[in-house]
Regions:
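Juxtamembrane intracellular "pre-TM" segments in multi-pass secondary transporters
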Residues: 2-17, 195-237
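Helix-loop boundary and gating motifs at the non-cytosolic
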Residues: 13-63, 234-239, 244-272
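Residue-level signature of mid-helix packing/kink "hotspots" within the transmembrane helices
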Residues: 35, 63-67, 71, 155-156, ...
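Helix-breaking motifs and short loop linkers at transmembrane-helix boundaries and internal kinks
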Residues: 49, 81, 102-107, 317-320
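Helix-to-loop junctions at the C-terminal end of transmembrane segments
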Residues: 70-81, 166, 283-296
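Structural signature of the two symmetry-related core transmembrane helices
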Residues: 84-98, 299-313
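Cytoplasmic helix-loop-helix junction between adjacent transmembrane helices
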Residues: 114-151
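Symmetry-related core transmembrane helices of the 12-TM Major Facilitator Superfamily/SLC fold
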Residues: 174-190, 392-407
Length: 415
């Protein structure tokens, strides 16, 4: 039984291209230092002594920067290619983190977090296009999952390591996070070669047709419309944004809930939160390998949204069950993440033409970036006005909206 399980686990990784593995290692190195974002709410309220509302505004500035960065990242990827965009954003991300370490003023922090959000999210469209370029239809969903496994392993390291580093001083979170950005950029530059892609600087080649005439191969692409005019894709983006706003509470408000209601310290919060990353890391690839062809992607996405709703409603039960509820939440929200994110990302990469891939993936990234504006703002304001319990019910209600949106999209595809 154990051998069979191990075999299934290893089989789920077979066939994934070497370049995707390298991209995953780059993300592993980079995200292992993502301690600042994981502990940002606690840093602002505990170390800098901002109230929950002010902290929410600063967190939303990170989200605003993320939206700008996602849009610019898509444009730059289409124009310059995914390779340059990735390593440049990593370098500037590291520089930004080291600068923000010295900021204490509210408005200066807002500007600093906007910049960090920009360079952080500009990386994502380029990274998604890179995975598509180095994978095929058979391995794409698993390639996306491998990337997420790497990210979740890294987040687990960041949560546990960050909780321990806080004891040495908050500045060490920024120092280590910056170092991992520089390390990831160095590995990308020295270990991965860029694959030629269609872009503004590398237009599609002319191809010969009958009678010796040449035509631009892009002119025969039947799907070159803008992502911003693709109504079906925009419905997908809206539903993704709603679902992401629910999921992002795990980052922005759940740590504050653990500290304020359950009374846990940073090390305990980091250890409990790491369950999410460990669960995704160990379960996602084998599970995706077994189920990816069983049903259509939207079916799994809707199942994941239901898991989100159930996980947050668990917090409405008495705090005397804190340990059981926290573990249940982390496991349930992890399954939601496993069902939602790889299948939605894989679906998104199949939309639009190759020349528009940066634009399509930028819009997908913008959905998550926008949620990074709305999620902390909504969460902190609801908490301040009505308390944590109200936030969990609001999260469940938003999950229902996302569920209906993906369901309607599924019906459109069946026509």
């Amino acid at each position: 039984m154990v051998i069979k399980t191990i075999t299934r686990f290893t089989n789920s990784f077979r066939g994934i291209p070497r370049e995707v593995w390298l991209l995953s290692v780059v993300s592993l190195i980079n995200r292992s230092g993502a301690m600042v974002i994981c502990f940002l709410t606690l840093y602002l309220t505990s170390a800098l002594h901002f109230d929950i509302k002010s902290a929410g505004y600063i967190l939303s500035c990170f989200g605003i920067g993320s939206i700008i960065g996602a849009y610019m990242g898509g444009l730059l990827t289409d124009f310059y290619g995914y390779y340059r965009v990735q390593w440049l954003t990593l370098v500037f991300h590291g520089i930004g983190l080291w600068a923000v370490m010295f900021f204490t003023d509210f408005w200066v922090l807002c500007i600093g977090m906007t910049f960090i959000g920009m360079v952080s999210e500009a990386f994502r469209p380029a990274n998604s296009v890179a995975i598509k370029q180095h994978s095929d239809e058979k391995t794409r969903t698993r390639s996306m999952s491998l990337m997420r496994v790497a990210v979740n392993l890294a987040i687990s390291v960041a949560l546990i390591g960050g909780g321990l580093l806080v004891a040495l001083g908050w500045k060490w979170l920024f120092i280590v996070d910056g170092l991992t950005c520089f390390g990831a950029a160095a590995m990308l530059i020295f270990s991965l070669k860029e694959k030629k892609q269609i872009s503004a600087q590398n237009p599609p080649p002319l191809r010969e047709e009958s009678f010796g005439q040449y035509i631009d191969s892009k002119s025969v692409d039947t799907n070159t419309r803008s992502a911003y005019r693709d109504k079906k894709y925009l419905l997908f983006i809206f539903s993704t944004f709603i679902g992401a706003t629910v999921f992002m509470q795990i980052m922005w408000t759940v740590p504050a809930f653990f500290k304020g209601v359950y009374g846990w310290n940073e090390a305990t919060i980091g250890a409990i939160s790491a369950i999410n990353g460990i669960a995704v890391m160990t379960l996602e690839m084998p599970l995706i390998f077994r189920i990816e062809h069983k049903r259509k992607p939207m079916w799994f996405v809707r199942l994941g949204i239901l898991c989100y709703a159930v996980s947050y409603l668990a917090f409405t039960f008495p705090a005397s069950l804190s340990w059981y509820l926290a573990v249940f939440f982390m496991i349930c929200v992890s399954f939601g993440e496993i069902f939602v994110m790889p299948f939605s990302t894989s679906w998104a990469t199949k939309q639009g033409s190759e020349a528009r891939q940066g634009q399509y993936m930028a819009l997908y990234t913008i959905a998550y970036s926008t949620s990074n504006v709305i999620a902390p703002m909504m969460g902190t304001q609801v908490i301040a006005a009505f308390g944590f319990t109200a936030l969990w019910w609001v999260s469940a209600g938003l999950s229902a909206v996302a569920f209906l949106g993906f369901g309607y999209l599924d019906r459109i595809e069946k026509r």
